[in-house]
Swiss-Prot record:
A Pfam family reported for this protein in Swiss-Prot or TrEMBL: LOR
Name of the protein described by the UniProt record: Protein LURP-one-related 12
Family to which the UniProt record says this protein belongs: Belongs to the LOR family.
Alphabetized InterPro entries for the sequence: LOR, LOR_sf, Tubby-like_C
One term under GO cellular component: cytosol
Gene3D superfamilies noted in UniProt: LURP1-related
Job of this protein: Might be related to the phospholipid scramblase and tubby-like superfamily of membrane tethered transcription factors.
């Protein structure tokens, strides 16, 4: 198990920690979350993220018929507290989105931005963090297929989005249920915020016939 480095620099962060939204969502080992499209169970379209015990960690509520009509989306914790607001920046050719700490207020400055690296076709996403460190991340892969790596400028993977396999049956579940695996020391709330943005930018291809759809389950 990889542990978070204990040396504490002047700015108060431990070495290896990447806090963008909330330090409460830093983990000292790989943290897999089961992420579900809430349209499976409720009216509207949003997300719910569960840990391996079945406890809800994050939620994103949307009551419109299509979340891609929304210019502003809120990421909440299990109690409904607003952790992060992501907002589409207009006009932009690169589909830029910005993230704001908590519930966004007029004139508030963003803490990060996400943009397509190209205006043509599927491409990588570029993430820039505005905390004075100059941190940048790349999102590589195809979110519509639930296959993405998020890595830093040193090519170290900090989070991964992948299809979920039912451990008991070895059946790959449908794309409305997938895994977000957060690496040690990376901000899980930030990672979930990036999932929300990816869903807005890339959207979903039509779900293939035969995709399994199930409620999140408790893992052994």
């Amino acid at each position: 198990m990889e542990l978070v480095e204990e040396t504490i620099p002047k700015e108060g962060k431990k070495m290896g920690e990447r806090i963008v939204v909330d330090k409460a969502y830093l983990y000292q080992e790989d943290k897999p979350l089961t992420v579900c499209k809430t349209s499976l169970f409720y009216t509207g379209d949003g997300f719910a993220a569960y840990d391996c015990r079945g406890d809800i960690i994050f939620r994103v509520d949307s009551y419109g018929p299509d979340t891609r009509d929304n210019d502003e989306i809120v990421l909440m914790d299990a109690t409904g507290k607003c952790l992060l607001t992501v907002k589409r920046k207009r006009p932009t050719l690169h589909q830029r989105w910005e993230g704001f700490l908590g519930e966004r207020s007029e004139g508030q400055k963003p803490i990060f931005s996400v943009r397509r690296s190209s205006i043509i076709g599927r491409c990588t996403m570029e993430v820039e963090v505005y905390d004075g460190t100059g941190e940048e991340y790349i999102i590589d892969g195809d979110f519509s297929q639930r296959s993405c790596l998020i890595y830093d400028t040193k090519k170290c993977t900090v989070a991964e989005i992948k299809r979920k396999v039912d451990a008991s049956t070895n059946v790959m579940l449908g794309r409305d249920v997938f895994t977000l695996e957060i690496k040690p020391g990376f901000d899980g709330a930030f990672a979930m915020g990036l999932v929300v943005v990816l869903d807005q930018i890339n959207g979903d291809d039509p779900v293939e016939i035969g995709d399994e759809q199930v409620h999140p389950f408790v893992e052994d």
